[in-house]
């Protein structure tokens, strides 16, 4: 039995190794990029540690660093970012509320994108191995759970070495994923069901995230206009 499983895993890895390796590298780099970009934005160490822990708890959902960084900064333009923060602060919004709101918005968007992205390798594998062949549950587990889990552990250690954490909070966030990873091997779901659920949830959550971002941008613009009018009157 063990030899048969070993042969199946080796065969699967040979036919789709580049997809699996690229997916793993992608998953490793994301939290490192997020940690670095966020560290440049937030100077308060206590807030920084809290946001890091929250991001790592939700990892591997944070899979698109560009989107997350854009949401966090309010745009790539430094002047625009500072202007938005000044307007919000002038309207009585606390600094911590701003970061919490941006974190929630980025989580919603990145979770949807992540679920979509996790569905794409499944279809690529299906096309490589033959479009009409249904690949095994082991392949789905490897791509959806094993690769992100291993990548999370590697990137967690990298973040710890590069940027530093207090009181070992980073490693505590891995416990839920250990339990979740163990449950995956006892799953009775079929691969096609995983594909459908992943893509449908991804589309729904991503759409909701886009709506949230659009609404937040409109609110910021509204606040900006009101603030400019008030400054003109004063």
Predicted regions and their residues:
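Transmembrane helix segments
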Residues: 33-37, 158-210
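Selective transmembrane-helix segments that form parts of the transport pathway or gating/packing helices
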Residues: 13-20, 68, 95-122
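Long, hydrophobic alpha-helical segments
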Residues: 53-73
